[in-house]
Curated annotation (Swiss-Prot):
Gene3D superfamilies: MFS general substrate transporter like domains. The lineage of its organism: Eukaryota, Sar, Alveolata, Apicomplexa, Aconoidasida. The gene is HT1. Residues 49-78, 126-134, 187-208, 316-332, 380-393, 452-456 are extracellular. One of its GO terms (molecular function) is transmembrane transporter activity. Inhibited by cytochalasin B. Residues 1-27, 100-104, 156-165, 230-294, 354-358, 415-430, 478-505 are cytoplasmic. GO terms for cellular component: plasma membrane. Keywords: Cell membrane, Disulfide bond, Membrane, Sugar transport, Transmembrane, Transmembrane helix, Transport. PANTHER family: PROTON MYO-INOSITOL COTRANSPORTER. Active from 32 to 42 degrees Celsius. Retains 50% of its maximal activity at 20 degrees Celsius. InterPro entries: MFS_dom, MFS_sugar_transport-like, MFS_trans_sf, Myo-inositol_Transporter, Sugar/inositol_transpt, Sugar_transporter_CS. It is found in: Cell membrane. The chain crosses the membrane at residues 28-48, 79-99, 105-125, 135-155, 166-186, 209-229, 295-315, 333-353, 359-379, 394-414, 431-451, 457-477. This is Hexose transporter 1.
Amino acid sequence: MNILRMDILSRGGTQEIEHRDGFFNTSFQYVLSACLASFIFGYQVSVLNTIKSYIVVEFEWCSTKTDTSCEDSILKSSFLLASVFIGAVLGSGFSGYLVKFGRRFSLMVIYIFFIFVSILTAISHHFHTILYARLLSGFGIGLITVSVPMYISEMTHKDKKGAYGVLHQLFITFGIFVAVLLGLFLGDGPKINGKSIELSNFEMFWWRFMFFLPTIISLLGIILLIAFYKEETPYFLYENGNIEGSKNILKKIYGPSDVDDALRAIKDAIDQNKAAKESSLSLLSALKIPAYRNVIILGCILSGFQQFTGINVLVANSNELYKEFLDKNLITILSVIMTAVNFLMTFPAIYIIEKIGRKTLLLGGCIGVICAFLPTVIARQVWGPTKIVNGLSIAGTFLMIISFAVSYGPVLWIYLHEMYPSEIKDSAASLASLINWVCAIIVVFPSDIIIKKSPSILFMFFSVMCIIAFLFIMFFIKETKGGEIGTSPYISLEERQKHIGKSKV
């Protein structure tokens, strides 16, 4: 396997970044340069939430000039929402190849990619152009899902990997929040002027500017990587023969006294990785072995259930949902508050992720979503859409967001890398990620249509799925907190030795 060697460590321009203790240390600086991509991830997923109706008007998707919710607009909006997730499926599959050329290199590619994609989206004048641009945006998001967590994992202190890993999710939620916040400048939707809806010059500019914004964030990311954070990760440098370069970065992350231990840990990890590759089982081969097939299927089911909590319907389509419960002028304000809660409630996850077991958090998240949606469904069936019931529905969405932000959101991605043994980790985790994106498409694509029919249908579906998820986690999912790297609580040492040999476990 040919890997591009990037000997990018230079003596000049890097010495100003010194080791510092605490959470906001050297690692945090490097992580921040990567988390700008996480911000773009969240922003791109949510940006359509507040501007769809303006696109409908400018592109004239409805023959009636006073309507923005005709069948054609709902269908095209559904395609635009789902296209991001379809693109992400493709991008996540390609990302494993991209990171082989360097973790920092992959971030540079992502930032450059989003400059062009954001400009293309902002200048779109036809449905097919904006659909193509949104597919490309999704492809970039797919690249981010692998590249950023890998960069963070390899650029952080071993005792803080969990906390820093949550920063990826934190910046995703911050991007979601900013996307909805910027929608406030557009007011409460397109205004009817006489016998038709007409957009003001500001409205026509602003929705395009919102698509353009990731270009500015990407330029900032490129500047940070070129001017300040020029180094590749210590793992990548060591793996490609630049041991001295790896030492220099580790001094900044760990301090001079702990470099030898950190370097030895990298060497051991690389040796284990090589052994795992030599002994690796292909996904098809692993699926033929009952013990491996079991853990692969469990991971895929767990990953799929995350989307069936309804998180991406709220993130990508909260404005449409709140139209069923609120006056028009309060919709975007409530979406801003909801995304702010989503952002703020990710902070507790930074501190509890290493204190509470993964399984406990997953179970708690499911209970939270059930308590959020099930009472709403019952109330709407008994009393109908009264003001009190609508208020309960809104409160339910907030409880769901809080529950997800401190549990299923960040925990799933950590768990998927802890549940699989090293010989199938890469391929199995990739498959689980693919299933997650496919389930997102299944949930998001029809959400516009179902919301128009009845929000209760969605709430009932999410409630039932979370009840099933709770039972599934309770009886089939095992705790992974504190486990050894490369092992699995689902497959015994003897079972692994039987299939890959004693010397390679």
